[in-house]
């Protein structure tokens, strides 16, 4: 029996069917008419490729002293024909105005912070410098006159506190230089020093003041204890009696060590107060709100 074979099975899953001659004639006149099935087109079954955007690299954002500037990520929706653009073109000028408002607030805050750093840095620098120099002169004078330290522990503890005070003076001068840098970068906030670096410097200055204050306190306590021991020894040996061997009365130079330790403590106290206030001003939450203009 002869049969007419249709084309072999295609990739779309249509299989070949064998038709008889009689059925072929009727199929040619009835089925393959103007009302016949549409011709098979493999292109219609091919999967449509969608043009999507898997990732979008947003422009780098600028974060300066609590403000986030720029970095807005536009939203694209998948489309089979073309990219979908924003429907409201007026949103771009609105974002620009918001960024300008944020930049103005950042510049204003940088200028205010620079003035605060300069004021407190100058107070801490000059106050610590005077107190530390006076303490160093008193300690040196007592050593030169007596020829040797009255108590080695007292001398070394007080000297360590004075050395830490000089380091704190140098740190306070760094605050003044930082204020000038902040004032220059208020025009271009992108060049401003990061807040993390400023906070790290302030914390380092606070640690120097705490260590120096502790050393000066130890020196003062040792000096006071030594003077109390001397005073008790002097009261046990009146002047009208014979002076025993090894007797050493309380001298004015011994009291100078107390004054040196007190000046060192004052120096570290000034530096600590200024550093803590500057740290508070930098890390305090920003209460200023950015006014967002309404786009018509």
Swiss-Prot record:
Tissue: Ubiquitous. Highest expression in green tissues and very low levels in mature pollen.
Gene Ontology cellular component terms for the protein in this record: chloroplast; chloroplast envelope; chloroplast inner membrane; mitochondrion
Compartment(s) of residence: Plastid, Chloroplast inner membrane
Mode of membrane association: Multi-pass membrane protein
Membrane-crossing segments per the record: 125-145, 156-176, 208-228, 250-270
Keyword Nucleotide-binding: no
Organelle transit peptide residues: 1-90
InterPro entries assigned: DUF3611
Phenotypic effect of disruption: Seedling lethal when grown on soil. Albino or chlorotic dwarfed plants that accumulate unprocessed precursor proteins and chloroplast ferritin clusters when grown in vitro.
Pfam families: DUF3611
A GO MF label: copper ion transmembrane transporter activity
UniProt key word Membrane: yes
Subunit structure: Homomultimer. Part of the translocon complex.
Function: Involved in chloroplast protein import across the inner envelope membrane. Also acts as a chloroplast permease regulating the iron transport and homeostasis. Involved in the uptake and sequestration of iron in plastids.
Protein name per UniProt: Protein TIC 21, chloroplastic
Higher taxonomy: Eukaryota, Viridiplantae, Streptophyta, Embryophyta, Tracheophyta
């Amino acid at each position: 029996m002869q049969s007419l074979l249709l084309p072999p099975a295609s990739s779309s899953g249509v299989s070949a069917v064998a038709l008889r001659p009689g059925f072929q004639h009727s199929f040619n006149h009835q089925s393959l008419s103007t009302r016949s099935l549409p011709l098979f087109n493999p292109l219609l079954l091919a999967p449509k490729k969608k043009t999507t955007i898997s990732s979008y690299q947003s422009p780098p954002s600028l974060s300066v002293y609590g403000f986030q500037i720029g970095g807005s990520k536009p939203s694209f929706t998948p489309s089979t024909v073309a990219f979908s653009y924003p429907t409201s073109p007026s949103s771009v000028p609105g974002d620009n105005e918001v960024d300008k408002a944020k930049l103005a607030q950042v510049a204003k805050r940088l200028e205010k912070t620079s003035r605060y750093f300069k004021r407190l840095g100058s107070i801490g620098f000059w106050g610590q410098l005077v107190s530390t120099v006076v303490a160093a002169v008193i300690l040196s004078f007592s050593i030169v006159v007596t020829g040797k330290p009255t108590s080695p522990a007292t001398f070394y503890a007080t000297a360590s506190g004075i050395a830490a005070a000089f380091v704190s003076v140098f740190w306070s001068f760094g605050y003044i230089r930082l204020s000038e840098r902040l004032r220059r970068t208020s025009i271009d906030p992108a060049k401003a020093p990061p807040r993390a670096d400023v906070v790290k410097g302030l914390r380092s200055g606070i640690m120097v003041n705490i260590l120096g204050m502790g050393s000066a306190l130890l020196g003062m306590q040792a000096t006071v204890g030594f003077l109390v021991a001397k005073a008790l020894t002097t009261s046990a040996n009146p002047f009208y009696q014979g002076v025993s061997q090894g007797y050493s009365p309380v001298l004015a130079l011994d009291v100078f060590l107390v004054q040196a330790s007190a000046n060192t403590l004052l120096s570290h106290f000034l530096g600590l107060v200024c550093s803590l206030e500057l740290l508070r001003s930098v890390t305090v939450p920003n209460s200023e709100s950015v006014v967002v203009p309404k786009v018509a």
